[in-house]
Amino acid sequence: MATDLSEAEPVHHKALPLLTGTQLIHTDKLSEKAEDDTMPIRRSVNSSRETPPKSKPAEGGEEVKADAEATSEESASAGEEQENETLPAAAPSEAEQPKEPENEEKGETKSSVETKKDDKDQSKEKEKKVKKTIPAWATLSASQLARAQKQTQMAATSRPKMDAILTEAIKACFQKSGASVVAIRKYIIHKYPSLELERRGYLLKQALKRELERGIIRQVKGKGASGSFVVVSNAGKTVQKARDRKKSTSVSTPEQQVKLEDILPLAFTRLCEPKEASYSLIKKYVSQYYPKLKVDIRPQLLKNALQRAVEKGQLEQITGKGASGTFQLKKSGEKPLLGGTLMEDAILSAIAAMNEPKTCSTTALKKYILENHPGTNSNFQVHLLKRTLQRCEKNGWLEQISGKGFSGTFQLCFPYYPSPDVLYPEKQQDEDSEESQEEEEEESEEEEESEEEESEEEEPPPKKRMQKRPPPKSRSRAPPMKRRESKPKPRKTPAAHQGKAKPPPKVKTPVKKAKPAAPAIKKPSGGSSSKKPTASGRKEVKPSAKGKSAMRKSLRAKK
């Protein structure tokens, strides 16, 4: 029994682990099923690890027992590990599922960013194409122009043509004998410094040659690019006739040729309100365009004029005291109160031109352009104004301060200081007419004086000849009479008494008596100089005869 029990014990011991092993295997299978249900991806990954333990129990009994004990311990730990792993494995699986939409969102954001970049590149390319340029009407000093040229480019299309500048200079510098090349050159250098005519003098020579060939100007003095020139008055009419003959469908008018881009700065200058400027700017403008007033040499004249205008109420002093500070124009309606004398006109044009910044509303611009430059169609002109404002804003010439689109207020981005001829052409025409009248009067006076001088020069020569002719006749006739009359009488005296020397002292006494006859010689003005000596000679001869008779009487008495 002992043996049976001893033999039976190991069997019993062996049977227990087998049962437990089968149970464990069953539990493993159940766990695998659970894994199959929950984690299909994990099964495929760990299938190589799970399959080998199934073949191991079939190899041998003892190995199975040892393995069963080991697996019992490992299975317990593996079960816990699997349970622990299932939780984090489920988490990444759940996390992996939402990663796909995130990737899709990222792809969409990337595509949107790329499209934005493309749009930015296109906009940059457009900005590069439309570069800011300096307009031709901008009034800049040499230093300001150099700075601006570094940042921007000069506008090539809107730059004024040399031919038009030349005709303007000839008209401005015109005098009696035409406009000299030196004066024309100075005018262009002073008014159009951007042309750099000091360095590029060939521009003026070429323009003179072209205009001479076209017949627009005429050379009065000199040859080539020197001398004086005059604008031909009928040249414009002939050019217009030729254009009318050539063109059959469209008729070109000067209003259509004028661009609104060139009109806008002057419109801003006239319409900007209120107009004000400092004393330094007024002085600079007056000294530049009114050299006759000599403000640089006599600044007190300008100061006194400004103070007088403030006292009269024609100007308002906003800042400063006395003649320093900022002055503002006062108006009665649309006309300024200041004006009349040359100094007042100079101050008026200086304040209107040097006012900065120059701003204007679109409504005022519309009104100004429709009144002064109506064109063929008013609606089309307004449309052109809208387009020019947009183009000028893109070029950087204008800036919109308020409003949007074609409404609000615009401002000039560059300084613009027009000359008095451009700002007030009517006054300049009046001044030119007055100057021409004065010149005509002076010319007429000079002609009259020259005619009088010529007549005086022509008349006196015959008088001088008449005066010169009679004296030689009287001289030629009178002297021989003297000699004939005087010669025989002295001959008689020595014949009567040759040896007596007493008569000479007695001859002196009658000479003394002849003194009262001296004033009688001075009195006759009409008598000639030749008659005077003859009369004196006769008087001298008479006393000599009386002396002789007295001597004879004395001799007789002695006898």
Curated annotation (Swiss-Prot):
Residues 158-233, 256-331, 339-414 form the H15 domain. GO terms for biological process: heterochromatin organization; nucleosome assembly. The keyword DNA-binding applies. Keywords: Chromosome, DNA-binding, Nucleus, Repeat. Residues 1-132, 421-559 are annotated as: Disordered. SUPFAM superfamilies: Winged helix' DNA-binding domain. GO terms for molecular function: DNA binding; nucleosome binding. GO terms for cellular component: chromosome; nucleosome; nucleus. Residues 51-68, 96-128 have a biased composition (Basic and acidic residues). It is found in: Nucleus; Chromosome. Pfam families: Linker_histone. It comes from the Eukaryota. Residues 516-533 have a biased composition (Low complexity). SMART domains: H15. Residues 429-459 have a biased composition (Acidic residues). Residues 463-515, 549-559 have a biased composition (Basic residues). A motif (PxVxL motif) lies at residues 256-260. InterPro entries: Histone_H1/H5_H15, WH-like_DNA-bd_sf, WH_DNA-bd_sf. A central region that included the first H15 (linker histone H1/H5 globular) domain binds at the entry/exit site of the nucleosomal DNA. Component of heterochromatin that maintains heterochromatin integrity during G1/S progression and regulates the duration of G1 phase to critically influence cell proliferative capacity. This is Heterochromatin protein 1-binding protein 3. The gene is HP1BP3.
